[in-house]
UniProtKB/Swiss-Prot annotation:
Compartment annotation: Cellular thylakoid membrane
InterPro entries in the cross-refs: PSI_PsaL, PSI_PsaL_sf, PSI_suXI
Gene: psaL
Segments passing through the bilayer: 108-128, 165-185
Protein name: Photosystem I reaction center subunit XI
Keywords annotated in UniProt: Membrane, Photosynthesis, Photosystem I, Thylakoid, Transmembrane, Transmembrane helix
PANTHER family: PHOTOSYSTEM I REACTION CENTER SUBUNIT XI, CHLOROPLASTIC
HAMAP family recorded: PSI_PsaL
UniProt cross-references to SUPFAM superfamilies, sorted A to Z: Photosystem I reaction center subunit XI, PsaL
GO CC annotation terms, alphabetical: photosystem I reaction center; plasma membrane-derived thylakoid membrane
Lineage of source species: Bacteria, Bacillati, Cyanobacteriota, Cyanophyceae, Synechococcales
Record-stated family: Belongs to the PsaL family.
Length: 199
């Protein structure tokens, strides 16, 4: 304890307030509008995690807790499969439409191979996160996620998530490739390619 703190803790004199600054109409149990929306610490104020109307709101909590990474009752492998499928599916379009081969006849196949390559790179990063010598970082409960999945943040759980991510990512890219190859999209592909043509 510093000398500055000691002077306050050892002081025997009572604190006196100036009467003109005291509002007698406010009672200790009154909750004002500002107090209802005040930012409060979640657990430990030193961590810096605050419960704000954004991260602890109903919509945000419902949205985040329904993502496959935090949804309750599914295995780590299925979490990875669902997350990877979304990544692979969403990566295929930008690689196909804006890739260097976008104006060639190989654009569809090049987009597929690029998306699968990106999924492989992300899978390698997930494997490195679970490298020997360190355990996965266990997320504590916070204002948005009250109950993070315990089975995911183990070595075996993270390995299952990674294998599911690889399979889902490759499958999602192949599914997008199959959709682009349908007859319905053959008429739309030249229009979409001309929108993003840069040269």
């Amino acid at each position: 304890m510093s000398d500055f703190q000691k002077s306050f803790s050892e002081s025997t004199s009572s604190i006196k307030f100036d009467e003109k600054y005291i509002d007698n109409s406010v009672q200790p149990n009154d909750i004002g509008v500002a107090d209802q929306w005040a930012v409060k610490t979640v657990d430990d104020p030193c961590v810096g995690n605050l419960a704000t109307p954004v991260n602890s709101g109903y919509f945000t909590k419902a949205f985040i807790n329904n993502l496959p990474f935090y949804r309750e009752g599914i295995s780590p492998n299925f979490r990875g499969l669902e997350t990877g499928a979304a990544f692979g599916y969403l990566l295929y379009g930008p690689f196909t439409m804006t890739g260097p081969l976008r104006n060639s006849e190989f654009a569809v196949t090049a987009g597929l191979l690029s998306a699968i390559g990106a999924v492989h790179i992300m899978t390698a990063l997930l494997v490195l996160y679970n490298a020997p010598g360190k355990a996965p970082n266990v997320q504590p409960p916070d204002a948005t996620v009250n109950n993070p999945p315990k089975d995911l943040f183990t070595r075996a759980g993270w390995a299952d998530f990674t294998s599911g991510f690889w399979l889902g990512g490759c499958g999602g890219a192949v599914f997008a490739w199959l959709l682009v190859g349908t007859l319905h999209l053959d008429t739309l592909m030249p229009i979409i390619k001309n929108i993003w043509t840069a040269g």
